[in-house]
Amino acid sequence: MLSSVWVALGLSLTCTSAFSLISPAWFQTPTFSFGILTYCSWPQGNSWNQSCVTFSSLEDIPDFAWKVSAVMLLGGWLLLAFNAIFLLSWAVAPKGLCPRRSSVPMPGVQAVAATAMIVGLLIFPIGLASPFIKEVCEASSMYYGGKCRLGWGYMTAILNAVLASLLPIISWPHTTKVQGRTIIFSSATERIIFVPEMNK
């Protein structure tokens, strides 16, 4: 049961993170929107007639802060995807092959992915000071959008980063010391594992 929940959470988090990365709605005006990898423009009052451009390489991204942010966010997403695939294989593997089902494997990978995503999200608004964005957002600067307002894509990316950082915290086994022995409590099972104390 626990493994299926973690697989569902890992896969859904990976999918929504990918969706927010390709979204052009991180910051927007009435006629323009942009994200980490895509920007779109349309005539005033006709948002159904959009013309969108995707940055095909890092050289096409207009600002260095954007490039760093894109690398961090894509790296974090790749780690999330790797972790989700690993969780899926862990969940469908026979119990004899993976005997320790009491805790979720590799919470550290997910923690590194969450850290990379958070750093990428914090670096991205520095790019609001670039000439490319100043032309659209008028009077924008670092961490200030000018006439551009936050879009749902950036908010979704923030929510994904928060969830990605909470999941590893939940999955770490809880430990307590009782009479010289370490007892590992796992919320996944009702077993208690006694670990003898090592002499220092």
Swiss-Prot record:
Keyword Disulfide bond among record annotations: no
Localisation per UniProt entry: Membrane
Record key words, sorted: Membrane, Transmembrane, Transmembrane helix
Family: Belongs to the TMEM211 family.
Source organism per UniProt: Homo sapiens (Human)
Any one GO CC term of the record: membrane
Name used for this protein in its record: LHFPL tetraspan subfamily member 7 protein
Parts of the chain that traverse the membrane: 5-27, 68-88, 113-133, 150-170
Pfam family membership, one: L_HMGIC_fpl
Gene: LHFPL7
Signal peptide region: none
Principal cellular location given in the protein's record: membrane
Membrane topology: Multi-pass membrane protein
InterPro entries, alphabetized: LHFPL (IPR019372)
